[in-house]
Design a protein with these regions (language model features):
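Residue-level preference for beta-strand/loop junctions
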Residues: 30, 67, 109-111, 153-155, ...
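Predominantly the C-terminal beta-signal and adjacent terminal strand-loop region
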Residues: 47, 59-61, 168-213
Length: 213
């Protein structure tokens, strides 16, 4: 618990620093961009499902998740129009938990807030890029016949690869793959009895439009 608080505080500080850097004026000429993205979230089953609270020590089978639409946006900067940049990436998806035998499915939504370092090839028309960094994942579990509504915030990581194609000097189309890994901790999923922890991993495919200035 202490380690989790420490990591969360460090990550929050890093995200805040990223936002402040993105929003502060810089004496160095930089290339800024904003982007909108739309795609699909292909989540692996929730694995390593373990009880928490009074249910600690109990294991459960994997929870299969549905494929869902995903959407979001980006705000980023390449200082000095160089190879390296940073970006704030926010995306949202709804990988609901599928039916568990005779138990109905459970609504699940996930908001991914990532602070990424990006390395690109700064071509005039084509710009392939890779990146990654820490993320905060805000997941909300819906109320069902077996669960209570619960929200958790966990630390995770994103890795991404994509390619951008400029259709004008300032407007580009892009496609991107992003992989996310985290551990969800729904401590109140079963009310006062306890909850569960599980490993969350997802693959996302996006297409988007970015404006550079």
């Amino acid at each position: 618990m202490v380690w989790t608080r420490f990591v969360c505080s460090r990550l929050s500080a890093g995200l805040l620093g990223c936002v402040l850097l993105l929003c502060s004026p810089s004496p160095i000429r930089a290339e800024w961009y904003v982007a909108a993205q739309l795609g699909a979230n292909f989540a692996d089953p929730l694995r390593n499902v373990r009880g928490s609270g009074t249910l600690a020590g109990l294991d459960a089978p994997n929870f299969n998740l549905k494929t869902s639409p995903a959407f979001g946006g980006k705000l980023g900067v390449f200082p000095g129009h160089g190879l390296f940049g940073i970006e704030l990436d926010v995306s949202h998806s709804t990988p609901h938990i599928k039916n568990l035998d005779d138990v109905p499915g459970i609504h699940l939504s996930v908001t991914n807030i990532g602070a990424h370092v990006v390395l690109r090839y700064p071509g005039v028309t084509w710009q392939p890029y890779i990146g990654g960094g820490p993320a905060l994942l805000v997941a909300r579990l819906g109320r069902s016949s077996t669960t209570e509504s619960d929200t958790q915030v966990s630390v995770g990581g994103n890795v991404l690869v994509g390619i951008r194609a400029f259709v004008t000097p300032k407007v580009a189309l892009f496609t991107e793959y992003k992989y996310t890994d985290s551990t969800f901790r729904f401590g109140g999923a079963f009310g006062p009895v306890g909850g569960f922890d599980a490993t969350y991993r997802a693959h996302q495919l996006f297409v988007g439009l970015s404006y550079h200035f």
